[in-house]
C-alpha cells in the first residue's frame, strides 16, 4: 500500500488522537500534542462526514475544555489550522482559541 505524505500525516494524527483519547478516558490530562491531535482529528473526520467549514470552526471550540488539558496548554494553542478534504475539495479550517 502506498501512502502520500499527506496521507501519512493524517494517519499519524489519527493514531496520536486515539492514544490521547485512551489516556483521557483513564482520567489523564492531555498535553499539547495530544490536545492538538484530538482537535485536528475531529475536524478531519467532520469534513469527511460532510460538515461545513463554518460549522467545523465552531465545533472545534467545543471538543476540549480547559479541565481536559494540563495547565498552560490552552494558552499555548492560540489557533489550530487543518487542511481538510471536503466533499467539494480541500479547504483550510481555522479554529481560534480552541480550548475554552
Curated annotation (Swiss-Prot):
CDD domains: Urease_gamma. It is found in: Cytoplasm. GO terms for biological process: urea catabolic process. Its main location: cytoplasm. Keywords: Cytoplasm, Hydrolase, Plasmid. GO terms for molecular function: nickel cation binding; urease activity. Pathway: Nitrogen metabolism; urea degradation; CO(2) and NH(3) from urea (urease route): step 1/1. It is an enzyme of class 3 (hydrolase). GO terms for cellular component: cytoplasm. Transmembrane segments: none annotated. InterPro entries: Urease_gamma (IPR012010), Urease_gamma/gamma-beta_su (IPR002026), Urease_gamma_sf (IPR036463), Urease_subunit (IPR050069). Its EC number is 3.5.1.5. The keyword Hydrolase applies. It catalyses: urea + 2 H2O + H(+) = hydrogencarbonate + 2 NH4(+). The keyword Cytoplasm applies. PANTHER family: UREASE. Heterotrimer of UreA (gamma), UreB (beta) and UreC (alpha) subunits. Three heterotrimers associate to form the active enzyme. Belongs to the urease gamma subunit family. This is Urease subunit gamma. It comes from Clostridium perfringens.
